[in-house]
Amino acid sequence: MSNEVDRMDVDEDESQNIAQSSNQSAPVETKKKRFEIKKWTAVAFWSWDIAVDNCAICRNHIMEPCIECQPKAMTDTDNECVAAWGVCNHAFHLHCINKWIKTRDACPLDNQPWQLARCGR
Protein backbone atom coordinates (compact mmCIF):
# COMPACT_ATOMS: atom_id res chain seq x y z
CA MET A 1 0.00 0.00 0.00
CA SER A 2 2.83 2.41 0.81
CA ASN A 3 4.27 1.88 -2.68
CA GLU A 4 0.96 2.92 -4.19
CA VAL A 5 0.86 6.07 -2.07
CA ASP A 6 4.39 6.97 -3.13
CA ARG A 7 3.49 6.69 -6.83
CA MET A 8 0.20 8.62 -6.66
CA ASP A 9 0.09 12.34 -7.28
CA VAL A 10 -1.56 13.48 -4.03
CA ASP A 11 -1.03 16.28 -1.57
CA GLU A 12 1.05 15.70 1.56
CA ASP A 13 -1.96 15.81 3.92
CA GLU A 14 -3.95 13.35 1.84
CA SER A 15 -1.11 10.82 1.68
CA GLN A 16 -0.78 10.96 5.48
CA ASN A 17 -4.54 10.38 5.86
CA ILE A 18 -4.34 7.37 3.56
CA ALA A 19 -1.38 5.93 5.47
CA GLN A 20 -3.10 6.48 8.83
CA SER A 21 -6.35 4.97 7.63
CA SER A 22 -4.57 1.84 6.40
CA ASN A 23 -3.18 1.27 9.91
CA GLN A 24 -6.53 1.87 11.67
CA SER A 25 -9.86 0.18 11.20
CA ALA A 26 -11.90 3.43 10.96
CA PRO A 27 -10.78 6.20 8.60
CA VAL A 28 -9.70 9.44 10.25
CA GLU A 29 -10.93 12.59 8.58
CA THR A 30 -8.69 15.57 9.25
CA LYS A 31 -9.46 17.62 6.15
CA LYS A 32 -10.63 21.18 6.66
CA LYS A 33 -13.85 22.35 5.09
CA ARG A 34 -13.34 24.21 1.84
CA PHE A 35 -15.84 26.88 2.86
CA GLU A 36 -18.58 27.47 5.38
CA ILE A 37 -21.90 29.15 4.66
CA LYS A 38 -22.58 31.75 7.33
CA LYS A 39 -25.57 33.48 5.77
CA TRP A 40 -28.00 32.37 3.07
CA THR A 41 -30.31 34.77 1.27
CA ALA A 42 -32.96 32.92 -0.71
CA VAL A 43 -34.35 34.42 -3.90
CA ALA A 44 -37.66 33.38 -5.40
CA PHE A 45 -39.32 34.22 -8.68
CA TRP A 46 -43.06 34.35 -9.16
CA SER A 47 -45.56 35.39 -11.76
CA TRP A 48 -49.29 35.95 -11.93
CA ASP A 49 -51.51 33.18 -13.19
CA ILE A 50 -52.71 35.30 -16.09
CA ALA A 51 -52.23 34.98 -19.83
CA VAL A 52 -50.85 38.53 -20.26
CA ASP A 53 -49.28 40.78 -17.62
CA ASN A 54 -49.64 44.02 -19.61
CA CYS A 55 -52.91 45.83 -20.15
CA ALA A 56 -53.60 45.40 -23.86
CA ILE A 57 -55.53 48.68 -23.94
CA CYS A 58 -52.98 51.13 -22.49
CA ARG A 59 -49.89 48.82 -22.82
CA ASN A 60 -48.75 49.48 -19.22
CA HIS A 61 -47.86 46.70 -16.81
CA ILE A 62 -50.96 45.50 -14.99
CA MET A 63 -49.47 46.33 -11.54
CA GLU A 64 -48.55 49.90 -12.57
CA PRO A 65 -51.06 52.73 -12.92
CA CYS A 66 -52.95 53.05 -16.20
CA ILE A 67 -52.55 56.15 -18.40
CA GLU A 68 -55.58 57.71 -16.71
CA CYS A 69 -54.12 57.23 -13.21
CA GLN A 70 -50.47 58.05 -13.97
CA PRO A 71 -50.74 61.87 -13.73
CA LYS A 72 -52.37 61.71 -10.31
CA ALA A 73 -50.40 58.71 -9.01
CA MET A 74 -47.65 60.88 -7.52
CA THR A 75 -49.94 63.30 -5.71
CA ASP A 76 -52.91 61.07 -4.81
CA THR A 77 -51.52 57.97 -3.12
CA ASP A 78 -54.89 56.92 -1.66
CA ASN A 79 -56.44 55.90 -4.98
CA GLU A 80 -55.21 52.67 -6.49
CA CYS A 81 -55.38 51.68 -10.12
CA VAL A 82 -57.18 48.35 -9.81
CA ALA A 83 -56.83 45.42 -12.19
CA ALA A 84 -59.84 43.56 -13.59
CA TRP A 85 -59.70 39.89 -14.64
CA GLY A 86 -62.17 38.41 -17.04
CA VAL A 87 -63.41 34.82 -17.05
CA CYS A 88 -61.07 34.33 -20.03
CA ASN A 89 -58.16 35.02 -17.58
CA HIS A 90 -57.10 38.22 -19.38
CA ALA A 91 -56.32 41.18 -17.12
CA PHE A 92 -56.77 44.89 -17.80
CA HIS A 93 -56.84 48.06 -15.75
CA LEU A 94 -60.38 48.64 -14.51
CA HIS A 95 -60.44 52.16 -16.00
CA CYS A 96 -59.26 50.86 -19.37
CA ILE A 97 -61.72 47.98 -19.64
CA ASN A 98 -64.62 50.20 -18.50
CA LYS A 99 -63.91 52.59 -21.38
CA TRP A 100 -63.56 49.64 -23.77
CA ILE A 101 -66.87 48.08 -22.66
CA LYS A 102 -68.73 51.31 -23.52
CA THR A 103 -67.89 50.83 -27.19
CA ARG A 104 -67.66 47.05 -27.45
CA ASP A 105 -68.79 44.34 -25.00
CA ALA A 106 -66.00 41.84 -25.77
CA CYS A 107 -62.53 41.03 -24.48
CA PRO A 108 -59.94 43.03 -26.47
CA LEU A 109 -57.64 40.01 -26.79
CA ASP A 110 -59.84 37.04 -27.66
CA ASN A 111 -63.10 38.74 -28.74
CA GLN A 112 -65.15 36.62 -26.30
CA PRO A 113 -68.07 38.31 -24.53
CA TRP A 114 -66.60 40.20 -21.56
CA GLN A 115 -67.51 38.84 -18.14
CA LEU A 116 -65.77 40.15 -15.05
CA ALA A 117 -64.33 37.33 -12.92
CA ARG A 118 -62.60 39.36 -10.20
CA CYS A 119 -61.30 42.81 -9.48
CA GLY A 120 -58.44 43.96 -7.27
CA ARG A 121 -54.71 43.66 -6.78
From Swiss-Prot:
Mutation effect (residue 72 to R): In RBX1-1; temperature-sensitive allele. At 38 degrees Celsius induces defects in ubiquitin ligase activity
Gene Ontology BP terms: cell division; cellular response to methylmercury; G1/S transition of mitotic cell cycle; G2/M transition of mitotic cell cycle; heterochromatin formation; mitochondrial fusion; mitotic intra-S DNA damage checkpoint signaling; nucleosome assembly
A single MF term (Gene Ontology): cullin family protein binding
Binding residues for Zn(2+) 2: 66, 69, 81, 95
Swiss-Prot/TrEMBL keywords: Cell cycle, Cell division, Cytoplasm, DNA damage, DNA repair, Metal-binding, Nucleus, Phosphoprotein, Ubl conjugation pathway, Zinc, Zinc-finger
Cell compartment(s), UniProt: Cytoplasm; Nucleus
Pfam families named in the record: zf-rbx1 (PF12678)
Binding-site list for Zn(2+) 1: 55, 58, 93
Annotated stretches, region: Disordered: 1-31
Record-listed Phosphoserine modification sites: 15
ZnF (RING-type) intervals: 55-111
CDD domains: mRING-H2-C3H2C2D_RBX1
Gene3D superfamilies per UniProt: Zinc/RING finger domain, C3HC4 (zinc finger)
Pathway(s): Protein modification; protein ubiquitination
Family note: Belongs to the RING-box family.
Subunit-structure text: Component of multiple cullin-RING ligases (CRLs) composed of 4 subunits: the RING protein HRT1, a cullin, a linker protein, and one of many alternative substrate receptors. Component of SCF E3 ubiquitin ligase complexes containing the cullin CDC53, the linker protein SKP1/CBF3D, and substrate receptors containing F-box motifs like DAS1 or GRR1. Component of RTT101(MMS1) E3 ubiquitin ligase complexes containing the cullin RTT101, the linker protein MMS1, and substrate receptors belonging to a protein family described as DCAF (DDB1- and CUL4-associated factor) like MMS22.
Protein name: RING-box protein HRT1
Species this chain originates from: Saccharomyces cerevisiae (strain ATCC 204508 / S288c)
